[in-house]
Design a protein with these regions (language model features):
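Non-catalytic tandem-repeat scaffold regions and their flanking low-complexity/translocation tails
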Residues: 1-256
Length: 256
């Protein structure tokens, strides 16, 4: 006999003392314990915990990962010990991001950031401490100019001299003329694309140039007779279906 979570055996050592631990609101968490071990409910056994003090770390915020727990001696992420983390001061400050008196942790991994609260977030993928720009793993974005760095939209960022797709440098992109490709939906109007961008000379998919693509006419539209989205310019179809509605659109716009 054993306890199971989502069909997976937890390998509980002492079934009489086993319990699923709750958060401060009384909801079940991903953690359990018996008098010998702690358990992360993916099946990870944490031996030799301090039974009296082993507890989930509640983030005291609506959206939290539930990935962290501690006893009075150690901190754990998904059942793995975080070496050097201070259990007395450790807390979850954002989804999967931990903080103690020493540093910030991303998914249980120590980072070079000392104080999460001193960071400014750019979009959802970048941070700044006023000296450097950091990606989601808190690695420095090499070459980024803090004074001119900005979030364009979604996955796109730039400074005075560079463009990035997430944390990848888009080589050859001109930040003065760069913009994400406009997306036109017959159902929902217009938006900007996560993955396609262009400047005055080139078109890019993520961080790579699309050879021979025509920047002036490059578009993304969901024609009603196409296969979902059609990505095209006046000369080529790069994604989707070369449909009658596309041909009609090109003829009306470019006479071809």
């Amino acid at each position: 006999n054993d306890f199971y979570y989502n069909g997976k055996a937890l390998n509980v050592r002492d079934k009489s003392s086993f319990e699923i631990l709750k958060d401060n609101s009384g909801e079940n968490t991903n953690w359990g314990k018996d008098k010998y071990n702690g358990y992360y409910l993916n099946g990870t056994v944490i031996p030799n915990i301090d039974y009296a003090t082993f507890h989930p770390i509640d983030a005291h915020r609506l959206i939290q990962s539930g990935y962290y727990a501690a006893d009075k001696y150690k901190v754990f992420f998904k059942g793995k010990e975080i070496p050097g983390a201070d259990p007395a001061t450790f807390r979850e400050v954002d989804f999967s991001i931990g903080q103690d008196k020493y540093r910030v942790y991303q998914k249980g991994i120590p980072t070079q950031i000392k104080d999460y609260n001193k960071l400014t977030q750019f979009g959802s993928l970048m941070y700044s401490d006023g000296t450097h720009i950091y990606d989601l793993d808190f690695n420095i974005l090499q070459g980024a100019d803090v004074a001119t760095f900005e979030h364009i939209s979604d996955n796109w960022y730039k400074d005075a001299s560079h463009v990035w797709w997430i944390n990848k440098l888009v080589r050859g992109a001109n930040p003065k003329t760069f913009s994400p490709v406009k997306v036109t939906s017959f159902a929902g109007g217009t938006s900007l694309d996560f993955n396609y961008g262009k400047d005055d000379k080139h078109v890019f998919y993520q961080d790579s140039i699309i050879p021979a693509a025509d920047a002036a006419s490059f578009e993304k539209i969901d024609f009603p007779d196409g296969d979902s989205w059609t990505v095209f310019d006046r000369n080529h179809v790069y994604q989707g279906k070369d449909s009658p509605k596309l041909r009609e659109y090109l003829k009306k716009k470019y006479g071809k």
